[in-house]
Amino acid sequence: MDLSWIVGAIAMAVLIAWYVSYGAARLDRLHTRVEGALSVLDAQLVRRAEATLELANCGALDAASALMLAGAASDSLEAESADQSSREAIESDLTQALELALGEEALRRLRVDEALGAPLLQRVAAANQRVELARRFLNDAVTDVRRVRRKPGVRLLRLAGHADLPQTFEIDDELPMLVRGT
């Protein structure tokens, strides 16, 4: 055997090892990005629930709306350890409760109350906007992981190991009435 064949085989083995190592490290970084984005989303969901609970307890809303918001916000705060599909449903319920409670009349009353209502309304709007952004970042990270894990080399060499395939977080988080008027 010629020396050039041996050098070529070693170079090819090094190249393959580098490719596998690079792919595994990239996939690990993407999974870490998903975990970080999930933590950020969780924190933003808690902030939104806390802001909603403060709004419910401020006294500027009618009793039925305040009770509905307080119940939905409390459910959201208690759902931190729930599985993802349950958490998605609970967070969507909180958004729906906000939509129902914050009708035109309630929004007008809150915006007029500059001492308490308007700042709390702005806090809920800002918290909801941060939830929307955090959810987008998470879903983008999940999409990137799924794209890399679909590659034949990653599947063939099982570079993902035993890591679960991450799932997107799908909730109703749009509150157009807060975006327009706040």
PLM ranges: what are they?
Residues D2-T182:
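A helix-centric hydrophobic-segment signal that preferentially recognizes long
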